[in-house]
Amino acid sequence: MVKLLLLNLLASIIFYTNIPLPYINGLDFQRVARLVPTVGLIIGGILGLFDGGMNYLGMPVLTRSALVVVLWIFITGGLHLDGAMDTADGLAVGDPERRLEVMADSATGAFGAMSAIAILLLKTSALTEIGEYRWLVLMAACGWGRWGQQVAIACYPYLKATGKGAFHKQAIRSYKDLLPGLCLMFAISGLFWLVNNHHLLISVVVLIAGSAIATLTAAWFNHKLGGHTGDTYGAVVEWTEALFLCVLTILT
């Protein structure tokens, strides 16, 4: 059981990131979405370690935050950011019937470029305003973003029968498949209180804000398109991360 879980986690990391790991024959990539919040926490942990190292070297917070965002893109290979860009291009089309066609086009349009700039600016500026427990904030942001992806998979129809993200529907079929990730994020939210018992309010806000932003972002894209695609899964991740960081600046 433990071996199978570790193999599934390895498959998820290989699928969703550029983290150099040995490839093992026979890995099952059909269920990678089940462990995607855990992958998010791993990504956030790496970003937190990098941020802490740069802080130790005396790097200014703005430069440090910008480098963290650059590393963020590198670790994920821009997978989710590309989806957010394609989604923005599709939503910019007035004709609903042409939106999926535009999203499938690999060429980046003006709205896609603007959405990428907006996401990167929001992440960088928000991180610059967050002074304490940045490692934990990064883990929470990455985790909630990917739990939002699970919400989109579980709760809404997939719009393409043979799309690149269609197989995720076989891994996450119902609301109960969201519970493991939610419990994991509940634990991460509780860490804010454990590291400082005066931060109980922050723990509660992290839990409520993270779950609400993830859920509402997935619902909004479903409202605009009538369902989801692999691109909108990426858009949910990126916008949940960015908006979550923005909300946390209020607490600091």
Curated annotation (Swiss-Prot):
EC number: 2.7.8.26
Keywords from the named record: Cell inner membrane, Cell membrane, Cobalamin biosynthesis, Magnesium, Membrane, Transferase, Transmembrane, Transmembrane helix
Catalysed reactions, semicolon-separated: alpha-ribazole + adenosylcob(III)inamide-GDP = adenosylcob(III)alamin + GMP + H(+); alpha-ribazole 5'-phosphate + adenosylcob(III)inamide-GDP = adenosylcob(III)alamin 5'-phosphate + GMP + H(+)
GO molecular function: adenosylcobinamide-GDP ribazoletransferase activity; cobalamin 5'-phosphate synthase activity
InterPro entries: CobS
Enzyme class, UniProt record, top EC level: transferase
Cofactor(s) needed for function: Mg(2+)
Pfam family, one: CobS
Subcellular location: Cell inner membrane
Pathway: Cofactor biosynthesis; adenosylcobalamin biosynthesis; adenosylcobalamin from cob(II)yrinate a,c-diamide: step 7/7
GO BP term, pick one: cobalamin biosynthetic process
Major subcellular location class: membrane
A single Gene Ontology CC term: plasma membrane
Keyword hit for Membrane: yes
Annotated coiled-coil segments of the chain: none
Membrane topology note: Multi-pass membrane protein
Signal peptide limits: none
Transmembrane segments: 4-24, 39-59, 65-85, 102-122, 135-155, 178-198, 201-221, 232-252
HAMAP family: CobS
Annotated family: Belongs to the CobS family.
Record PANTHER family: ADENOSYLCOBINAMIDE-GDP RIBAZOLETRANSFERASE (PTHR34148:SF1)
NCBIfam families: cobS
Entry function: Joins adenosylcobinamide-GDP and alpha-ribazole to generate adenosylcobalamin (Ado-cobalamin). Also synthesizes adenosylcobalamin 5'-phosphate from adenosylcobinamide-GDP and alpha-ribazole 5'-phosphate.
Official protein name in the record: Adenosylcobinamide-GDP ribazoletransferase
Organism for this UniProt entry: Nostoc sp. (strain PCC 7120 / SAG 25.82 / UTEX 2576)
Lineage: Bacteria, Bacillati, Cyanobacteriota, Cyanophyceae, Nostocales
